[in-house]
């Protein structure tokens, strides 16, 4: 795509931010990752519990669940901790459910056995795309946690059936663009989050017009951008998992 845009970052329409995935970022979790989409930075951990929720007892399968949060000063101005307010915001609940759905789409939960994989995504710096970065990083953390289950003989076969990653797209300055940062997200005409698997299947598409409706042609262009961007992200995941320390 050669469309000329006036993106605040100076990126071309189809250009991702610099993406980095750092494994084994914290000491205690079975899987831990620092994922960076430009200036957006998220710590993703995967922890194993040898139990399942009550609704899955005696069912012979496991569960994967996710939680999401932001440090008070992850954004331009400080926000109170949700624990101090006594409740999670609707946004937080929506995002952590999305992360859980995205990862469960590539898990065979029966192979996991009667245990739970807890995914925690904590945003330490936000510049747009925190939910998509969380999904992309959390998958790598989950892979490392599963590798430990395999290495210790607690499971015989990996429950992971494919890769999964996510990216944002939108219409900015009249042009479909990939991987919106905060400045673009706050000014765009359309904002869309797309989750896809390694084999090209769609897990979730969240799209909203921010005042100016988008056409079917624009939606198709956005999905094409997202598909190409996610293919690059999955290549980054594979590169990280193949790096020393796997």
From Swiss-Prot:
Specify which residues bind phosphate according to the UniProt entry for this protein.
91, 129-131
According to UniProt, the name of this protein is Ribonuclease PH
Top-level enzyme category? transferase
What reaction gets catalysed by this protein?
tRNA(n+1) + phosphate = tRNA(n) + a ribonucleoside 5'-diphosphate
- Which PROSITE patterns does the record cross-reference, listed alphabetically? RIBONUCLEASE_PH
Query: Mind listing the UniProt keywords for this protein, alphabetically?
Result: Nucleotidyltransferase, RNA-binding, rRNA processing, Transferase, tRNA processing, tRNA-binding
GO molecular function terms attached to this record: 3'-5'-RNA exonuclease activity; tRNA binding; tRNA nucleotidyltransferase activity
Q: Which organism is it from?
A: Paraburkholderia phymatum (strain DSM 17167 / CIP 108236 / LMG 21445 / STM815)
Q: Which family does it belong to?
A: Belongs to the RNase PH family.
| Stored InterPro entries | ExoRNase_PH_dom1 (IPR001247), ExoRNase_PH_dom2 (IPR015847), ExoRNase_PH_dom2_sf (IPR036345), PNPase/RNase_PH_dom_sf (IPR027408), Ribosomal_Su5_D2-typ_SF (IPR020568), RNase_PH (IPR050080), RNase_PH_bac-type (IPR002381), RNase_PH_CS (IPR018336)
Q: Which biological processes are named by the entry's GO terms?
A: rRNA catabolic process; rRNA processing; tRNA processing
State whether it acts alone or in a complex, and with which partners, per the record: Homohexameric ring arranged as a trimer of dimers.
């Amino acid at each position: 795509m050669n469309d000329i845009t006036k993106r605040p970052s100076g990126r071309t329409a189809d250009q991702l931010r610099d993406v980095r995935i750092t494994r084994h970022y914290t000491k205690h979790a079975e899987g831990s990752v620092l994922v960076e989409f430009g200036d957006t930075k998220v710590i993703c951990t995967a922890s194993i519990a040898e139990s399942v929720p009550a609704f899955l007892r005696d069912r012979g399968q496991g569960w994967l669940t996710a939680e999401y949060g932001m440090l008070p000063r992850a954004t331009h101005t400080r926000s109170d901790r949700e624990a101090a307010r006594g409740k999670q915001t609707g946004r937080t609940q929506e995002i952590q459910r999305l992360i859980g759905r995205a990862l469960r789409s590539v898990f065979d939960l029966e192979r996991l056995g009667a245990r739970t994989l807890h995914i925690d995504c904590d945003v330490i710096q936000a510049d747009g795309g925190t939910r998509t970065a969380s999904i992309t990083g959390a998958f790598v953390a989950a892979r490392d946690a599963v590798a430990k289950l395999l290495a210790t003989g607690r499971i015989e076969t990996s429950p992971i059936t494919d890769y999964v990653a996510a990216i944002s797209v939108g219409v900015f300055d009249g042009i479909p663009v990939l991987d919106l940062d905060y400045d673009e997200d706050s000014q765009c005409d359309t904002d869309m989050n797309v989750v896809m698997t390694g084999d090209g299947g769609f897990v979730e598409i969240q799209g909203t017009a921010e005042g100016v409706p988008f056409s079917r042609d624009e939606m198709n262009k956005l999905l094409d951008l997202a598909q190409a961007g996610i293919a690059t992200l999955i290549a980054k995941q594979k590169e990280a998992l193949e790096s020393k320390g796997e």
